[in-house]
């Protein structure tokens, strides 16, 4: 055999081996294909097994009897029949996502949006290197975002929004070079904005809304030239308006609302971002003027910059924005209360597509122009409230046929309401409160069948309440209080099935409260106080089972209290200043939610119950009912006589009548003698001491003057410094003792040399004289006289609080009496005090006939009685909202006192903002944080922008509630009994929510007290019982 044969044989053998090898390879490939198809199937079945049985039914086709590629939501490739897409969006599936999903190696699209998946996102998803579309939004996923998702290098869409994901955005996401959409909004993400995202040059949409990401926006973002949608609203970003955003000239949608951006906006803003259609920048701290160049953005459709600190005029050039749909500039400082402030409204008549216009709560002045009637007929909301706009509402308002909300409240408007309002059939809210409007309420308002809110309170409307309002069948809140309305309450109002609030207080209404009041099944609050209503209180009130506030005081109701034992949700019940008679029902002691009960100045007789609300004299009042007996000892009522046996009852009755008649005659004779003596002394005193002050203070004197200067001088030792217990904005407070029982009192002497003190005196008398609440300090009497040198003298005499003020308890080391180790407050006591203060503020803000803003809530104005119950004091700063003296408004508000105390005063007060109940909310929030941290807002720790609010907020984000808590609390025993961290965290959150810088971001006092009471019930149930 030669070499050629050997070679030939080797070639033949090699060919055979190759043939065998190829055949084996084909077999292996076929087997591999079969295995991988089976792998996809098993992966999906494993996925199904992790879905709860109740929601698994929609995956019924996922079984061995049907081909894999025909399963619900499954898509396969045409060539290899491998699974390339899984779309289970919106199927409401519950469970966890199986890690076997990572075995779907050909998967290009995975949609699990709008389900209820929970747990962590499996890291195995990072194995899907072909994945282009991943949507897991609107689920319940928690934990961190898996860094391995950055391995999915083909991703163009990544949507993990609306979950509970935590920690930061992975820096590695900067390597996803094909990413077009990145949506991580509505999670709990923290940390900084990754600069690496500047590498995503294909990115067009970025959404980080509603997280807790902080810091500044990195300059690298300027490289995202294709960006058209950029939303980082409701985070914690700070610094000036992000400079790199000015380079994103392709932007169509920009939202940075609800952060802490500050500084001014560039004048060329509109030239740099010429393609914007939607611009949201509200709830930040921007200052300066609105850039005129915004009007160069011809495509602009929505411009919303509320709740900042913008000043200057609203540009007339906005009239060039032909596509404008929405303009929101409310809660700034735009305008200067001058006549030209509203000129922009004329320019906006050119914006024919305008649907929403809100410039409320600025500094706009001038007359309401008639050309507002020429605004777009597509306008659905017109809000100009909270300014100083004068003039009248033009008849042409009826041209705005699409209007749903009309808010002109808290202005200086006068004149009559135009009947054309009734032509606006789409109206839902009419808010015209706190103006000087007069005339009759137009009956045409009854034509607005869909009306839900009608606020006409605090005007000068007269005439009767239109019966046509009974046609407004969707009315929820009807507030006509503090007007001059007369006649009776129309029975048509009792036919409103959805009415929740009915307030007709402080009018001149007559007649009975109608029996058909019981038809209002959903009524939460009924206030008919201070009218001239008569007759008996209808028994049908018992049918209003939702009632929480029933205010009938200041009328002429007669007869007994009806059986309303079914109204177990009552919180405030005031029947005072009527002619009611009979006994006080025992069942009222079972009203467990009742916070305030006032039965004073009636003709009730019999025994006062001793349980429930009747155990607390600060929560109820029965004075002025001379025939009452019994009750708890502190009421100091006569004891109830023991009932006599029946056989002697008639004789005893005759004896009782005779004796009573004789005693009454003697008493009357004595009273006449006393009165004549007093009258002679009174005339002599008036002639000797009273001068022109009689004219200024006569309404107050006639009701309050019960004590002389001489008495106060003696009881305070000549106003000696040894009896000085404090001082405030308008004077000093001394301790004294009055009456035969030497009752301790606190005497507040007003400093009349300080501007506003006399007005403070009148305001405080008016405020305290008309309200009663267990957490408000009680006014005992006043003195309006002259001192020994003939100078005017004004003093308020309060009930003395033996435990001083809250400031002494929170900061005992700063008081001279540092040796008192018992002056400490535990967690439960502090929470109770906070709830007491909140309760007083809710009452002032909501249940007085005019809302009252205290304007100086701070620990030294919170007094503690012997039981450590808190009482809010010092109404010297209180302004009765909605009743400002229009002529001297600016003078009154410019006084230093009304702006509150540094550290506790709301930020808007420092910028000329109106005194408001939301300012009290801020002050309460700061006090609440001080109560539990033990740190004053003026602590030297708070510098360089750090405040008690931001200090607490930062600690909450880091879950360090215990680290900022007052050590006195931590030394207590509570930590052994319950989760103190959770309790403190919840309390701090309430304080932070109340003390937000912008008023619109603060919760109401009603919401605050609800949260605090809920915390107490959750953690201190044993202590309460």
Curated annotation (Swiss-Prot):
It is a single-pass type I membrane protein. The modification Phosphothreonine is found at residue 716. Residues 31-653 are extracellular. The active site is at 856 (proton acceptor). One of its GO terms (molecular function) is protein serine kinase activity. The chain crosses the membrane at residues 654-674. ATP binds at residues 725-733, 748. This is Putative receptor-like protein kinase At3g47110. It comes from Arabidopsis thaliana (Mouse-ear cress).
């Amino acid at each position: 055999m030669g070499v050629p044969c050997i070679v030939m044989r080797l070639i033949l053998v090699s060919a055979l081996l190759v043939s065998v090898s190829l055949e084996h390879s084909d077999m292996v490939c076929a087997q591999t294909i079969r295995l991988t198809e089976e792998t996809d199937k098993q992966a999906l079945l494993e996925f199904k097994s992790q879905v709860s049985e109740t929601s698994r039914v929609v995956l019924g086709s996922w079984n061995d009897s049907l081909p894999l590629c025909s399963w619900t939501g499954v898509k396969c490739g045409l060539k290899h029949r491998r699974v390339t897409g899984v779309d289970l969006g919106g199927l409401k599936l519950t469970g966890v996502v199986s890690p076997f999903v990572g075995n779907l190696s050909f998967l290009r699209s995975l949609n699990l949006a709008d389900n209820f998946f929970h747990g962590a996102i499996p890291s195995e998803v990072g194995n899907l290197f072909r994945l282009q579309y991943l949507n897991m939004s609107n689920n319940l996923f928690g934990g961190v975002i898996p860094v391995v998702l950055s391995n999915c290098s083909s991703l163009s869409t990544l949507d993990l929004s609306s979950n509970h994901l935590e920690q930061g955005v992975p820096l590695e996401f900067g390597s996803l070079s094909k990413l077009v959409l990145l949506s991580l909004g509505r999670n709990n993400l923290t940390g900084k904005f990754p600069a690496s995202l500047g590498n995503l040059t294909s990115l067009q949409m970025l959404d980080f809304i509603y997280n807790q990401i902080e810091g500044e926006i990195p300059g690298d973002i300027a490289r995202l030239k294709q960006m058209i949608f950029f939303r980082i609203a409701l985070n914690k970003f700070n610094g000036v308006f992000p400079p790199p955003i000015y380079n994103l000239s392709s932007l169509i949608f920009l939202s940075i609302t609800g952060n802490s951006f500050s500084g001014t906006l560039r004048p060329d803003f509109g030239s740099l971002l010429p393609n914007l259609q939607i611009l949201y920048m509200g709830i930040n701290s921007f200052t300066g003027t609105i850039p005129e160049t915004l009007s160069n953005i011809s495509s602009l459709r929505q411009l919303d910059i509320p709740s900042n600190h913008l000043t200057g005029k609203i540009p007339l050039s906005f009239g060039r924005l032909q596509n404008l749909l929405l303009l929101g500039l409310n809660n700034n400082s735009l305008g200067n209360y001058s006549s030209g402030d509203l000129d922009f409204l004329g320019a906006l008549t050119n914006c024919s597509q305008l649907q929403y216009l809100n410039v409320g709560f600025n500094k706009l002045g001038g007359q309401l122009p008639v050309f507002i009637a020429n605004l777009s007929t597509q306008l659905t909301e017109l809000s100009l409230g909270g300014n100083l706009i004068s003039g009248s509402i033009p008849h042409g308002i009826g041209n705005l046929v699409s209007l749903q909300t009309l808010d002109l409240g808290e202005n200086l408007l006068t004149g009559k309401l135009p009947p054309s309002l009734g032509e606006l059939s789409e109206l839902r809210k009419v808010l015209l409160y706190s103006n000087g409007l007069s005339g009759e309420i137009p009956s045409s308002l009854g034509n607005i069948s869909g009306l839900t809110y009608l606020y006409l309170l605090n005007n000068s409307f007269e005439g009767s309440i239109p019966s046509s309002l009974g046609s407004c069948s969707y009315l929820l809140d009807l507030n006509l209080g503090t007007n001059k309305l007369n006649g009776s309450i129309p029975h048509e109002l009792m036919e409103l099935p959805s009415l929740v609030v009915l307030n007709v207080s402080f009018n001149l209404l007559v007649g009975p409260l109608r029996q058909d009041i019981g038809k209002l099944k959903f009524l939460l609050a009924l206030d008919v106080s201070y009218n001239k209503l008569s007759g008996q209180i209808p028994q049908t009130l018992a049918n209003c089972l939702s009632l929480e506030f029933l205010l009938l005081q200041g009328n002429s109701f007669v007869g007994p209290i009806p059986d309303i034992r079914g109204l177990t949700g009552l919180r405030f019940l005031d029947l005072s200043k009527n002619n009611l008679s009979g006994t006080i029902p025992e069942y009222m002691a079972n009203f467990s939610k009742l916070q305030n009960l006032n039965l004073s100045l009636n003709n009730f007789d019999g025994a006062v119950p001793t349980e429930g609300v009747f155990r607390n004299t600060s929560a109820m009042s029965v004075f002025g009912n001379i025939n009452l007996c019994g009750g708890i000892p502190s009421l100091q009522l006569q004891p109830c006589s023991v009932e006599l046996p029946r056989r002697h009852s008639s004789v005893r009755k005759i004896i009782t009548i005779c004796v009573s008649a004789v005693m009454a005659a003697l008493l009357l004779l004595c009273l006449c003698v006393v009165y004549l003596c007093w009258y002679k002394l009174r005339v002599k005193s008036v002639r000797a001491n009273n001068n022109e002050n009689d004219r200024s203070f006569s309404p107050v004197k006639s009701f309050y003057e019960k004590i002389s200067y001489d008495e106060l001088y003696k009881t305070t030792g000549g106003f000696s410094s040894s009896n000085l217990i404090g001082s405030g904005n308008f004077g000093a407070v001394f301790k004294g003792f009055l009456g035969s029982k030497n009752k301790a009192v606190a005497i507040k002497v007003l400093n009349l040399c300080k501007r506003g003190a006399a007005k403070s005196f009148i305001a405080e008398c008016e405020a305290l004289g008309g309200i009663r609440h267990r957490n408000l300090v009680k006014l005992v009497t006043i003195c309006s006289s002259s001192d020994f040198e003939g100078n005017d003298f004004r003093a308020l005499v309060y009930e003395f609080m033996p435990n001083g003020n809250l400031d002494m308890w929170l900061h005992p080391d700063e008081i001279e009496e540092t040796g008192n180790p018992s002056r400490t407050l535990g967690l439960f006591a502090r929470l109770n005090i906070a709830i007491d203060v909140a309760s007083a503020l809710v009452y002032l803000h909501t249940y007085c006939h005019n809302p009252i803003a205290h304007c100086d809530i701070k620990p030294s104005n919170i007094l503690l009685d012997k039981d450590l119950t808190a009482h809010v004091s010092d109404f010297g700063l209180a302004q009765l909202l909605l009743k400002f003296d229009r002529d001297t408004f600016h003078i009154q508000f410019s006084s230093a006192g009304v702006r509150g105390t540094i550290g506790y005063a709301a930020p808007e007060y420092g910028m000329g903002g109106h005194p408001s109940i939301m300012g009290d909310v801020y002050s309460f929030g700061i006090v609440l944080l001080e109560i539990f941290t033990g740190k004053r807002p003026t602590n030297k720790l708070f510098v360089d922008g750090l405040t008690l609010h931001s200090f607490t907020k930062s600690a909450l984000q880091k879950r360090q509630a215990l680290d900022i808590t007052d050590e006195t609390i931590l030394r207590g025993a509570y930590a052994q009994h319950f989760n103190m961290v959770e309790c403190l965290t919840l309390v701090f959150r309430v304080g932070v929510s109340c003390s937000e810088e912008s008023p619109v971001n603060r919760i109401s006092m009603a919401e605050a007290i609800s949260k605090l009471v809920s915390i107490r019930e959750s953690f201190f149930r044993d202590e309460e019982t």
